[in-house]
Amino acid sequence: HAIMCAEKAINSPFAVINADDYYGREAFKIMNGHLSGLDANSTEHAMVGYILENTMSKAGSVSRGVCEIKDGYLESMKENTKIYYEGSKVITELDGEKKELSGKEWVSMNLFGFSQKAFETFHAYWDDFVANNITSEKAEALLPAAASQIVTDGKGKIKFYSSPEKWFGMTYPEDREIVKQEIAAKI
């Protein structure tokens, strides 16, 4: 929804990030390198993914788009809205069932790069989302789902770039001290 609100102001390939996440310097360099070579009609978009265990919070569950990658491109992405530590194990709950993850899975942290061509899919995704959730008070249009639709609809590809960096962000109030320490260490 936020991307669509900004559509009229976007006149070149663009990146999307979450405001409360730290992605690391290299991730931005990677994305800049990809976007610098795109034109407005390119159908090759990009994302920077992270290793799941580098994106977890000790304070509670997180939501992550777990990625399947093939030949350097996103093949699919499944949003897991409840991933958490249970002791030393990484657990996800999908469709009411607990499943252990390795922690080595590639996940989306919503660092995407798109050409303006992506808006065609975003509009279709949004229209379907609104039509199917018109009475829901809790439904959320998720960027990973909209990005995945580009791939599943055959409207483009999403080049997958990996980041070995440790993500940090403000998922829970308890994360504040860790974030302060991480930022101070980078200054």
Where in the sequence are the language-model features?
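Short beta-strand-to-loop acidic/aromatic patch adjacent to the donor-nucleotide binding site
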Residues: 12-22
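Conserved alpha/beta core of the MobA/IspD/sugar-nucleotide pyrophosphorylase nucleotidyltransferase superfamily
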Residues: 70, 77, 84-187
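Conserved core of the sugar-phosphate nucleotidyltransferase
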Residues: 25-112, 116
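Short phosphate-binding loop-to-helix
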Residues: 1-13
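Active-site phosphate/pyrophosphate- and oxyanion-stabilizing loops and adjacent acidic/basic residues
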Residues: 4, 29, 148
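Residue-level signal for inorganic ion chemistry
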Residues: 6, 20, 51, 115, ...
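Short coil/turn segments at beta-strand junctions that form active-site/ligand-binding loops
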Residues: 12-13, 43-44, 156
